[in-house]
């Protein structure tokens, strides 16, 4: 099933039970929850969204299990400073969700990047992700070309999403 673009976030309402099989509402809520967790930049917190034996492919790196996820994210956020991420539901079916995303960050030399990508997720019966496949491309940008300007942490509900920003 394909997702409808521009779905409004309803973070002020109670979250439905986010387990498969996903509906449009639960898939979109799952995507926003993942975005919020990643924007925390807390590797331990993020890792809890994945099974202890989770399998990832992130670019050309293979990551297996929560311990490796924590180590991977710790390295990532030491390099990718002032990281801000937007995820958008692309498609869903059963226990699978496809997402497109963009994030902005800079390195320790002050060089800014916007990274674009797609993720394919598969969840266990408890709604915990056990497979994550990510393809990512990096685009150098000028600081003046940044589009993600909220304070570090959770993206505000009124901040535009990827489609709204024309990305």
PLM feature spans:
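Short, flexible active-site loop motifs that bind/organize anionic cofactors or intermediates
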Residues: 17, 36, 59
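Short, aromatic-enriched amphipathic alpha-helices that serve as compact interaction elements
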Residues: 23-40
């Amino acid at each position: 099933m394909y997702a409808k673009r521009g779905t409004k976030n309803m973070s002020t309402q109670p979250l439905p039970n986010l387990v498969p099989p996903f509906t449009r509402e639960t898939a979109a809520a799952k995507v926003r929850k993942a975005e919020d967790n990643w924007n925390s930049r807390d590797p331990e917190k993020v890792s809890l969204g994945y099974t202890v034996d989770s399998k990832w492919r992130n670019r050309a790196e293979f990551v297996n299990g929560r311990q490796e996820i924590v180590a991977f994210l710790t390295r990532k956020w030491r390099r990718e400073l002032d990281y801000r991420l937007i995820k958008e539901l692309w498609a869903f079916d059963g226990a699978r969700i496809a997402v497109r995303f963009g994030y902005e960050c800079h390195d320790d030399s002050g060089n800014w990047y916007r990274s674009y990508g797609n993720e394919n997720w598969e969840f266990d019966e408890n709604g915990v992700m056990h497979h994550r496949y990510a393809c990512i491309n990096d685009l150098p940008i000028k600081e003046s070309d940044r589009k993600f300007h909220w304070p570090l942490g959770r993206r505000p509900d009124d901040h535009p999403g990827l489609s709204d920003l024309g990305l």
